[in-house]
């Protein structure tokens, strides 16, 4: 099942998104500096870029499953693309180490995971069908203009 159909699916998606963000950018703490698996893998040729693309792809897929707004998915895709391009700077002679350090410092996965989680928080997910009382209540609030959140029906 690709699209989330229940609040349990949404809970699992959120856990997955947070896990990817934390593993990528928040595993080891050196005072105010936080490093993750991505920063360590960045210094192995091509492994950091492959990890970045896979982890970023998983974040985008989970965002699609949670039906976050397209603008959020575009921003996440942009961040992951920029992060991957920075990481490929090691292919240019003379700037390899600088590019590796910049890629390790750019926390694109954590930022992207936080953007997806925030978009999920700003969405009212309704589990049910058109005949349910909750559906009618939300529809009335939307028509009256009192519901300011984005509404997504899971059923």
Regions found by a protein language model. Name each.
Residues 1-155:
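Feature detects long, helix-prone N-terminal segments enriched in hydrophobes
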